[in-house]
């Protein structure tokens, strides 16, 4: 099973049936996994911000956890207005962003980026989330998804997860 198949199946088993997002190279595997799962629906927006607000509206209207996704870099940054909306309205929403291949991260002080659209999304999301993480080791996905789900669905709820 692909890691993204696991992510979609995990969220589907938790009750998420609708995913809102905007396609991009670094999130393509997740989108493929959403599309091939017969128990969920993908809703493509014209902009990542629209996907974020759609997930917020879904969570508010349904009283259930919403989910939005975007690719890395500017795509992920475009989610932030919706992320803040979910945070301030205490809405249960999980945001998933694409990331670089792990070998592409620079980690070099003074070097802006090495990989395609490299951006520190976790630092950008932390002020308006209850939890923001970048999962670099596939072995950690089970633990991080369970923690993400638990935090997103607690009384003071909201979560952003960067995968």
Could you say what each language-model-derived stretch is?
Residues 1-163:
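N-terminal alpha/beta PP-like core and its mobile active-site loop of ThDP/TPP-dependent enzymes
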